[in-house]
């Protein structure tokens, strides 16, 4: 509903449980990824053509001829799919609490943020309200654009620089975490 705001008069963050969010791997694997990411993956000296292989080691499904610049952050590689012939620009952030699926020939430019996570503003506990993101073949997420949870970027779509793209009514309804 356009212009609709959800107002919660009393927030009770102490009751936050994180229900419905599965990191997808045990803590030792998470720790190994964080160490590897911070010590090598994001560094300028780590070759861009090696980054896809390192993501694959940690469970990502990465296609051929993928070019990933330095300072690209990936929360959980095992929740990431990247098709062939994609470019991911410097300082992009793939915040994949839920899966991010990037089709072939996609350009994600410098400083872009793809964030599958959110919170339920109507819930006093502020529980998660996450949903996957899909990016269609040939799309371009321009510099410093933000793509929010539940969005489906159409094939060939351009998300202009500095804009925010959220799920629209035509996008799949994001699933509410922890609801029955």
Residue ranges, per PLM feature:
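Terminal amphipathic alpha-helical/low-complexity segments used for targeting or macromolecular assembly
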Residues: 1-60, 138, 156, 173, ...
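Left-handed beta-helix
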Residues: 64, 69-70, 75-76, 83-84, ...
């Amino acid at each position: 509903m356009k212009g609709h705001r959800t107002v919660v008069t009393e927030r009770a963050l102490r009751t936050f449980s994180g229900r419905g969010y599965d990191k997808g791997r045990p803590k030792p694997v998470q720790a190994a990824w964080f160490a590897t990411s911070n010590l090598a993956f994001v560094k300028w000296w780590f070759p861009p053509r090696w980054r896809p292989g390192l993501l694959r080691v940690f469970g990502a499904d990465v296609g051929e001829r993928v070019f990933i610049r330095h300072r690209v952050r990936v929360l959980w590689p095992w929740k990431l799919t990247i098709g062939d012939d994609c470019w991911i620009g410097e300082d992009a952030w793939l915040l994949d609490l839920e899966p991010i699926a990037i089709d072939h020939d996609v350009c994600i430019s410098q400083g872009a943020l793809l964030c599958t996570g959110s919170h339920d503003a109507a819930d006093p506990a502020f529980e998660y309200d996450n949903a996957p993101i899909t990016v269609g073949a040939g799309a371009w997420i321009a510099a410093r654009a933000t793509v929010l949870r539940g969005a489906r970027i159409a094939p060939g779509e351009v998300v202009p620089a500095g804009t925010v793209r959220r799920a629209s009514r035509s996008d799949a309804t994001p699933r509410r975490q922890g609801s029955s």
